[in-house]
From Swiss-Prot:
Organism of origin: Serratia proteamaculans (strain 568)
Protein name: tRNA-specific 2-thiouridylase MnmA
HAMAP family: tRNA_thiouridyl_MnmA
Gene3D superfamilies the record matches: Adenine nucleotide alpha hydrolases-like domains, HUPs, Translation factors
Keywords: ATP-binding, Cytoplasm, Disulfide bond, Nucleotide-binding, RNA-binding, Transferase, tRNA processing, tRNA-binding
Chain segments annotated as transmembrane: none
Disulfide bond annotation, renumbered to this chain: 103-200
Amino acid sequence: MSDNSQKKVIVGMSGGVDSSVTAYLLQQQGYQVAGLFMKNWEEDDDEEYCSAATDLADAQAVCDKLGIELHTVNFAAEYWDNVFELFLEEYKAGRTPNPDILCNKEIKFKAFLEFAAEDLGADFIATGHYVRRQDVDSKSRLLRGVDGNKDQSYFLYTLSHEQVAQSLFPVGELEKPEVRRIAEQLELVTAKKKDSTGICFIGERKFRDFLGRYLPAQPGPIVSVDGQTVGEHQGLMYHTLGQRKGLGIGGMKDSSEDPWYVVDKDVANNVLVVAQGHEHPRLMSVGLIAQQLHWVDRLPLSGPFRCTVKTRYRQQDIPCTVTPLDEQRIEVRFDEPVAAVTPGQSAVFYQDEICLGGGIIEQRLQE
C-alpha cells in the first residue's frame, strides 16, 4: 500500500449514498478526506428548496459521523452560464441535450476540480461515480464501473486523462448493493435514500412544466410519415425521437394496430413526424455523424478504427466503425441498424472496458 496519509482528497458530497461511501472508503485508504457540497442551482420554489436543504443536511450528517469537515460552495452562476443556457439553446434548436454530461464537464471536473486544488489545497477530488481509473504508462484511462447496471462512464466521456489522473472513484470498484450494505453497517443517514433521478436542476418536477417556464411553447401539427395530420403537439421541445407516450393520438390508427412513435422533428416547419411501430424504417439509423469530440487520451485520430458505441445511457454496446471526417467530426457506421439515434445526445465509444471518449450526435444516417 502506498502511503496516502499526506494526500488530501476533497469528495463531492451530494447527500446521496454513493458519495457518502466514497468518503468512507478513502478514509479507510488512509487519505486526508474532506467533503464539498456544491450548490449549482438557485431554487425557485419551496419543494426544490426543501430537497436541496435535505441533501445538504444529509451530507453534513454523514461528514459529522465520519469526523470530516464539510465545505460548501455556490457554483450556480457557472452552472447557469455553462450548462443551463446551452441546454436551453439545444432545445430551441430541436435537439435533445444531456445536461448531466455538461455538468460533469463544466462543473464537477472543472469548477470543482479548480476550487478543490486552488482554494482547499487538494491533491485529488473524488466523486461517487461508478467508473474506474487505470494508470498506464503515466497516462490515466477511464474504465467502466464494475457494476454493469450502474456504470456511469457514458456521462464522463468528456474528461481528459489529466482530469482522470486528478480524480478518485472508489465505488466504481464495487457493485451497488455492496455500497448500500457498507452505508447500512456504518448507520449513515443516506443508507436507504433512493437514488436521485432526472436532471439535477429539475429534480422530480414535471419536465414539461419546467421547460415551459423558460421557453415559450409553440404548438403545431403532428403528421404521419404518409403526410396525414393526426394530431397537435404542444411544442417540439417536449418530444424526443423514439418517444411513444404523451403524444395524445392513441385512438388514431393507420391500417396497423401498432402504437405511434416520434420518428422526426421538422424544426423549420414546427412539425412532429410520427409513424407506427418501434422498428419503423424512419426510426432506424445505419450510422451517425458526431462533432464536439473529446477523446480521453486527447490524441487525434489517425484513421478508421473498430470499437463499440452507445448512443444513449444504458444501451447495449453497438459494434461499429469510426472514420474521422476532419478534426472535429467523425462518421460512425453501425454493424446493425439502431433505433432512435437522437441529435444532441452523446455517442460514447468503448474498447472493451476502456471508455475512449465521444461526441455530440449532429445527424443520424439513414438508408
